[in-house]
Swiss-Prot record:
This is Holliday junction branch migration complex subunit RuvB. Belongs to the RuvB family. GO terms for cellular component: cytoplasm; Holliday junction resolvase complex. The keyword Hydrolase applies. Mg(2+) binds at residue 68. Residues 184-254 are annotated as: Small ATPAse domain (RuvB-S). Homohexamer. Forms an RuvA(8)-RuvB(12)-Holliday junction (HJ) complex. HJ DNA is sandwiched between 2 RuvA tetramers; dsDNA enters through RuvA and exits via RuvB. An RuvB hexamer assembles on each DNA strand where it exits the tetramer. Each RuvB hexamer is contacted by two RuvA subunits (via domain III) on 2 adjacent RuvB subunits; this complex drives branch migration. In the full resolvosome a probable DNA-RuvA(4)-RuvB(12)-RuvC(2) complex forms which resolves the HJ. Residues 1-183 are annotated as: Large ATPase domain (RuvB-L). The gene is ruvB. It comes from Moorella thermoacetica (strain ATCC 39073 / JCM 9320).
């Protein structure tokens, strides 16, 4: 399944301990996303000097780029507590109300996958975000009554991979909107070298670059690949990650020079071989490779679009000339 892919940006269970050990705790340690860092730094400093809660922050972009890490950094920089939850975990309005009423002044509440909040939960967020009040309905039917509770000023940090799915009323209540972009190879090299130092892994500069080139512009993938290449180096190469060792390990793991794995190649080959390169509808393509449409949109497509191997058109998905070239297929070869 896509959730277990080595190069997928979503969080694996085995990633949690690794990410905690590698996660930067302040903006100065955070590598990449320079524009986001600069703007957040200004807003955080201003809120801190005024003794106010920071405006609500929406972080959006593909998975694995550091949204959760930034939420923790915001809380650390403000000197307040971080409360963490997710959209799917908040099934009832009471679940969110319990969290909100236990916040301390200026605390940061982080809601991951905020686009998956149930509507009834989302609606109690509106007055909480705008006026720092919580409206609770007691009872049912004609005898129901509403009471209003004051909340301490707080900062909501919402994270999503699909900002377009947020309702307008919710999106409009975020004062700070920051899109996280894919990382450059040089930035990923720096992240890998930092992680190698923390993990006490011997790595040469060219080894770090080889991993960075195949990490799909995503720090989470870079750290995961480093962990796997470290295992290979310890067993097959005396523990030192050189360029050749990294290349051998990643080829063994079926991660090619562009960062595509067997699942990416299967999607592109299916599009080319079965559907003549497209266009083909999302549902049809998903069925052809036995994946969920949401998985294709959230996990596969961001990187394939970024690399120019795939196009979304009004008529469906289309494989680009770049995809043919990468797979070593001539456009005329697609015809049967």
């Amino acid at each position: 399944m896509a959730t277990e892919r080595l190069v997928a940006g979503n969080l694996h269970n085995e990633d949690q301990e690794l990410e905690l050990s590698l996660r930067p705790r302040c903006l100065a340690e955070y590598i990449g996303q320079e524009h986001v860092k600069e703007t957040l730094g200004i807003f955080i400093q201003a809120a801190r000097e005024r003794g106010e809660a920071l405006d609500h922050v929406l972080l959006y972009g593909p998975p694995g780029l550091g949204k959760t890490t930034l939420a923790g950094i915001i809380a650390n920089e403000l000197g307040v507590q971080l409360r963490v939850t997710s959209g799917p975990a908040l099934e009832r309005a009471g679940d969110l109300a319990a969290i909100l009423t236990n916040l301390q002044p200026r605390d940061v509440l982080f809601i991951d996958e905020i686009h998956r909040l149930p509507r009834q939960v989302e609606e109690i967020l509106y007055p909480a975000m705008e006026d720092f009040v919580l409206d609770i309905i007691l009872g049912k039917g004609p005898g129901a009554r509403s009471i209003r509770l004051d909340l301490p000023p707080f900062t909501l940090v919402g994270a999503t991979t699909r900002a377009g799915l947020l309702s307008s009323p919710l999106r409009d209540r975020f004062g700070i909107n920051s899109r996280l972009e894919f990382y450059q190879v040089a930035e990923l090299e720096e992240i890998i070298r930092r992680a190698a130092t923390i993990l006490q892994v011997a790595i040469e500069p060219e080894g770090a670059r080889e991993i960075a080139r195949r990490a799909r512009g995503t720090p989470r993938v870079a750290n995961r690949l480093l962990k796997r290449v470290r295992d290979y180096a310890e067993i097959r190469a005396g523990g030192v990650i050189t360029r050749e060792v990294a290349r051998e390990a990643l080829e063994l793991l079926q991660v090619d020079a562009a960062g595509l794995d067997s699942s990416d190649r299967r999607l592109l080959l299916t599009l080319i071989r079965k559907f003549n390169g497209g266009p083909v509808g999302l549902e049809t393509l998903a069925a052809a490779i036995s994946e969920e449409p949401d998985t294709i949109e959230d996990v596969y497509e961001p990187f394939l679009l970024q690399m120019g191997y795939l196009q979304r058109t009004p008529r469906g998905r289309v494989a680009t000339p770049g995809a043919y070239a990468h797979l070593g297929i001539k456009p005329e070869d697609r015809l049967f």
